[in-house]
């Protein structure tokens, strides 16, 4: 039998043993875990300890395609191409210059060109820098075959724009190019990168945000030096840009291009009931694809320095004296203001003397004789409108009606860099030249000369207002936005009123009648005669200081005269004075109208209109 003291001692020892186990077991577990972390998984955790952030690389989205109004075949697509990138930090410093020189040789550029894109302070950076784009597959293959000698060099797909329909569409569609430093400064917070391709002109620029799409992302884990350490990055796929369907009809565009020919000028075909632009041609034009070429900078400078200014869209970016086409505004103002009875005649003796200056009508002495409004308009008598402007309206009323027609202000068409033209007033002249407005100034403006200026599109809007009897719809080139995958229409552009006049309906009817009378009994009877459709029009001949005995030729028209506005088109053509045959505007306009309503090609329209024998000047048409 054990003693009580022994039992107590044993019990105490057991408790100490249990306590020791409780203490030692977690300690040994901790030691084993520490051994595992330091020895077995040490490299893993050391990597994790250095992984302080993620690097996000942008995957460019395919740019959206552009279609004409029929949305069948694209006018602009993307073509496979590549870009080459340098990650400077991956190149051993002692080999940097050798690697870059070798890469430059493969890319057919100089080492200095690459050095300009990678300043010395970036040479240890692990950021990826694009050094060249628009590289063909063969060049990429050559680089790939020498990859071991080119550390830090990578490449990726970077499609280029392929403009399938060049020529006159260049001013409408525009072109793209690498984003500039100034552009990136403005756009960087909208998802653009230093490697982005952006629209430079035309639709490409106007709707760049829609065409860009949503770029994808490649997310990689990087260490403290910026070096990628993740084996497999996370990929977020890009979404292609929206497809844009334009209001342009490719067949009509081609017809207008051929009708204008190689004559410096512009022509616009507009649907007055909606504001849709069916065709817009400015000559000379250019090939948008040249900006994809190696020597694009050289070609751009050639275009920039060309005296005929092929980069300018004359339909919206140049303004001209509207000449006698402005007599539409003058006649409207006269009728609405009851400034002078339309049936009362004014005598034209071929000239007027005012302020010590002799003003000659285009029909010299003895002049047109006695003319009422209808015949004064149809014969485009300057004496008639000089009298109305100076004695019956005055510059303030003339300017007010000009602005009501949309002159002197933006047409708000969806194209960048348009001009507003000019509606001069006495106040404007005082501010501009510090000179008093004279009666002779009013006379000049009354026939669309002097300081008065307008774009071809503004004149198309003027004709649209006559056709619509007081309404101008906002001119536009975008018809629809479509999903690039499903082709579903996501947005349709609705007609939007730009200007609505309070001029009496009876006034519009009379203006329409005298425009029709101009075709049947006025100055352009021969070039505007048409058996297919009734045309209403007005000619214009603008004097140009730098050209002696040469003039800008205008023709503004709508057709059919006897149809409702929704079935009509408006056509405006200007042929500049620098052409060998500047009188072509009426002929070109009639060819366009004939081709559209007879569903004919240019050659067929010319033949049916009997214009094939025209080989010399026909004479001035006011």
Could you tell me what each predicted segment is?
Residues 1-295, 319, 344, 396-404, ...:
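Periplasmic/cell-envelope proteins involved in peptidoglycan metabolism and beta-lactam response
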């Amino acid at each position: 039998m054990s003693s009580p003291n022994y039992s107590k001692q044993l019990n105490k020892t057991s408790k100490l043993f249990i306590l020791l186990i409780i203490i030692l077991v977690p300690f040994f577990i901790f030691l084993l875990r520490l051994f595992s972390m330091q020895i077995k998984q040490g490299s893993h955790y050391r990597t994790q300890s250095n992984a302080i952030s993620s690097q996000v690389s942008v995957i460019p989205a395919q740019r959206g395609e552009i279609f004409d109004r029929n949305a069948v075949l694209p006018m602009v697509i993307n073509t496979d191409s590549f870009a080459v990138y340098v990650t400077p930090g991956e190149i051993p410093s002692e080999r940097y210059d050798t690697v870059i020189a070798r890469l430059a040789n493969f890319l057919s550029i100089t080492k200095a060109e690459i050095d300009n894109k990678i300043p010395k302070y970036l040479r240890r950076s692990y950021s990826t820098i694009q050094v060249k784009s628009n590289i063909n597959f063969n060049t990429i293959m050559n680089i790939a075959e020498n990859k071991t000698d080119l550390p830090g060099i990578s490449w990726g797909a970077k499609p280029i724009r392929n403009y399938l329909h060049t020529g006159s569409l260049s001013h409408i569609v525009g072109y793209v190019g690498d984003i500039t430093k100034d552009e990136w400064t403005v756009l960087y917070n909208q998802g653009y990168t230093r490697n982005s391709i952006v629209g430079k002109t035309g639709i490409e620029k106007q709707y760049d945000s829609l065409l860009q799409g949503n770029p994808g992302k490649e997310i990689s884990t990087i260490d403290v030096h910026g070096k990628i350490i993740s084996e497999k990055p996370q990929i977020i796929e890009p979404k292609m840009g929206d497809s844009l369907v334009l209001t342009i009809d490719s067949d009509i565009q081609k017809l207008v291009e051929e009708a204008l020919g190689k004559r410096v000028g512009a022509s616009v075909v507009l649907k007055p009931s909606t504001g849709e632009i069916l065709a817009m041609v400015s000559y000379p034009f250019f090939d948008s694809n040249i900006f994809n070429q190696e020597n694009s900078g050289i070609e751009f400078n050639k275009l920039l320095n060309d005296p005929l200014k092929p980069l300018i869209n004359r339909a919206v970016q140049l303004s001209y004296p509207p000449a006698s086409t402005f007599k539409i505004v003058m006649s409207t103002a006269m009728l609405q203001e009851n400034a002078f009875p339309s049936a009362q005649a004014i005598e034209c003796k071929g000239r007027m003397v005012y302020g010590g200056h002799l003003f000659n009508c285009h029909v010299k002495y003895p002049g047109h004789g006695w003319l009422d409004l209808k015949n004064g308009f149809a014969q485009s008598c300057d004496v008639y409108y000089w009298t109305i402007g100076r004695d019956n309206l005055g510059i303030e009323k003339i300017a007010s009606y000009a602005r009501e027609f949309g002159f002197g202000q933006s047409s708000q068409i969806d194209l960048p860099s348009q001009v507003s033209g000019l509606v001069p007033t006495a106040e404007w002249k005082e501010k501009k030249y510090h000179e008093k407005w004279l009666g002779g100034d009013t006379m000049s403006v009354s026939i669309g000369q002097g300081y008065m200026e307008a774009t071809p599109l503004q004149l198309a809007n003027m004709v649209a207002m006559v056709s619509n009897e007081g309404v101008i719809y906002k001119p536009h080139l975008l018809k629809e936005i479509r999903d690039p995958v499903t082709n579903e229409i996501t947005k349709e552009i609705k007609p939007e009123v730009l200007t609505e006049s309070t001029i009496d309906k009876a006034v519009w009817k009379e203006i329409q009648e005298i425009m029709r009378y101009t075709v049947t009994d006025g100055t352009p009877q021969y070039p505007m005669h048409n058996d297919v459709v009734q045309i209403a029009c007005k000619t214009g001949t603008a004097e140009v200081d730098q050209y002696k005995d040469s003039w800008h030729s205008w023709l503004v028209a709508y057709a059919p005269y006897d149809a409702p506005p929704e079935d009509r088109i408006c056509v405006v053509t200007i042929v500049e004075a620098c052409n060998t045959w500047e009188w072509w505007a009426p002929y070109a306009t009639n060819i366009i109208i004939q081709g559209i309503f007879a569903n004919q090609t240019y050659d067929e329209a010319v033949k049916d209109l009997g214009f094939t024998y025209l080989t010399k000047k026909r004479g001035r048409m006011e």
